């Protein structure tokens, strides 16, 4: 089956790819070295890109995560500018960063299940 992918989905995937390239090749801030973009969603009108990220080996409440969040917020304009230069879009979307807690939540649930299964009755 050959299903066509919607334009917002294609743009979101390309923004994710572009942001990963920028983070790993062009960003010199050491607070962003372990940042990994997990997902990008874009509004239907392509004006807002919601970017979810994690930090390898770090919990959201840890200091390195807080530092990375601040660095991403500070560099939002740079990321938007680079997306505009690298992608052929009529309007460069506003970039909004959010820490992705899915992996942490899954790990916590897995831990709870493990404890429940191995608890002595």
From Swiss-Prot:
User: What highest taxon heads this organism's lineage?
Assistant: Bacteria
Tell me which Gene Ontology terms the entry assigns under biological process: maturation of SSU-rRNA
What keyword terms does UniProt attach to this protein? Cytoplasm, Ribosome biogenesis
Cellular location of this protein? Cytoplasm
Q: Name one GO cellular component term.
A: cytosol
Task: Return the similarity comment.
Answer: Belongs to the RbfA family.
Q: What is this protein called?
A: Ribosome-binding factor A
- Tell me the organism's taxonomic lineage: Bacteria, Pseudomonadati, Pseudomonadota, Gammaproteobacteria, Thiotrichales
Name the gene behind this protein. Answer: rbfA
């Amino acid at each position: 089956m050959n299903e066509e992918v919607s334009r917002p989905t294609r743009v979101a995937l390309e923004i994710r790819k572009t942001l990963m390239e920028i983070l790993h090749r062009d960003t010199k801030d050491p607070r962003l070295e372990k940042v990994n973009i997990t997902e990008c969603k874009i509004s239907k009108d392509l004006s807002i890109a919601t970017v979810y990220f994690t930090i390898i080996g770090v919990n959201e409440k840890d200091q390195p995560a807080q530092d990375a969040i601040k660095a991403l917020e500070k560099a939002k304009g740079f990321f938007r500018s680079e997306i505009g230069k690298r992608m052929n879009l009529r309007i460069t979307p506003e970039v909004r960063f959010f820490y992705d807690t899915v992996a942490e939540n899954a790990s916590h649930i897995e831990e709870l299940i493990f404890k429940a299964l191995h608890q002595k009755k």
